C-alpha cells in the first residue's frame, strides 16, 4: 500500500515537471529545473560558520549555531530548549 502511494506520488510529480517543461520555450529548461531541485549546497554548515541540527560536534567547543547545543551523549548539535 505504501509503495503504491509512493509510486503514484512520484508519477504525479514527474508528470507535472515534464508537462511544465514542455510548455517552456527554452530547450534547456528541464536541465535547469532539475539542477535547481537537486541543489543541496545551500544547506551546508561550512558556509554559515557554525554547525546546524544533526551535524557532528565536540562537546564544550561551542561549534553549534545559536539556539543549538552539542549533545554530550550523541555528539551532534540539537535544538536547545533551555530548562
From Swiss-Prot:
Pfam family, one: Toxin_12
PROSITE patterns per UniProt: HWTX_1 (PS60021)
Tissue-wise expression: Expressed by the venom gland.
Cell compartments where the protein resides: Secreted
Cystine bridges: 50-65, 57-70, 64-77
Residue list for modification Leucine amide: 81
Annotated GO MF terms: ion channel inhibitor activity; sodium channel regulator activity; toxin activity
Stated role: Lethal neurotoxin. Selectively blocks tetrodotoxin-sensitive voltage-gated sodium channels (Nav). Does not affect tetrodotoxin-resistant voltage-gated sodium channels or calcium channels.
Quaternary data: Monomer.
Protein name per Swiss-Prot or TrEMBL: Mu-theraphotoxin-Hhn2j 4
Species of origin: Cyriopagopus hainanus
Phylogenetic lineage: Eukaryota, Metazoa, Ecdysozoa, Arthropoda, Chelicerata
